[in-house]
Amino acid sequence: MKLKDTGLTFQDIKDKVNKYMIETYERFDFLAETAEDMYIYDENGTPYLDFYAGIAVNSAGNCNPKVVAAVKDQVEDIMHTFNYPYTIPQALLAEKVCETIGMDKIFYQNSGTEANEAMIKMARKYGIEKYGPNRYHIVTAKMGFHGRTFGAMSATGQPGNGCQVGFGPMTYGFSYAPYNDLQAFKDACTENTIAIMVEPVQGEGGVHPATMEFMQGLRKFCDENDMLLLIDEVQTGWCRTGAVMSYMNYGIKPDIVSMAKALGGGMPIGAICATAEVAKAFSAGSHGTTFGGHPVSCAAALAEVNELLDRDLAGNAKKVGDYFASKLEKLPHVKEVRHQGLLVGVEFDDTIGGVDVKHGCLDRKLLITAIGAHIIRMIPPLIVTEEDCDKAVAIIEDTIKSLEK
């Protein structure tokens, strides 16, 4: 939809949003009207260099032509049914995902938080059915983030964070331990613990990758204690971190893994994959969804996954991510650069505010975001080049210099 075809102005659009929408977002003051590859364009055709990819969604590029074509083709065949009949996109995507990442079964959802809800439910049901009614406890990481629905929100180890404040008591059955502290996780487990649930990189927590010792230690500890290892790959999954799934960087395999974002290439979809044994916890009636496995979303996801794999965008994420980090480390006021592939966080010293850098970059037509007082995060499409990174670094440097004045 183009603004010129509506007879409205950009201010009219903003007025309608302010009047009718419940706003929980700090809006950027521009209209995203069209997009292609590494750029988003406003109503005047002004390009914005996209280093956020719709929050790690558009990994094969904005409006990837093969994804767009898959959506158009599927819309003309069948847009929606329910999960009683079989559909071709569901079946083909299930095979592609499971065979690619080495898991046995998949269950479709609509989003990342729903995928994490399903993962929590499956783990608890598995524990209760196999070991008895008290085996439902799950240990998660402090400063993690798993979503905004009640189970996922309760699993988020940030008591007092805005996503938890004001909603009353959290769902019972979770404990939190410091990230990358293997012994603390072991100590947090009890005889009632059925699972440990972590992100391989804490994105919202400031872009902190897990250590090899931590991830391999969790896998070993879970194996030794009849516990499940749940890995949240909503943000890290599908080539973002230099491997198809981030857990592959650690040479381990989860019992259940959640995914969303990049899986759909811009269409809403989430999923969990599980081992055959754990997947048996779900049977008819134990979980369900109206829109999960939507034919159009599955068609888009299949096209997106094929693009990511055929173009080796995991390899590009590793190569360009290392290059980008090396350039960012040379900027003034940079305290630390943390990254895994193209999930990149830059922490500045106390004189530079992350939000100030974010807004300064927006003024210079670069889209990034801020997390924490002095941290910016960048999650560009995985088609990004070293030249794109050079442009971004130059804009960030110019912004930093303007904040020194």
Q: How would you label these PLM feature ranges?
A:
Residues 1-405:
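Conserved N-terminal phosphate-binding loop of PLP-dependent enzymes in the Aspartate aminotransferase
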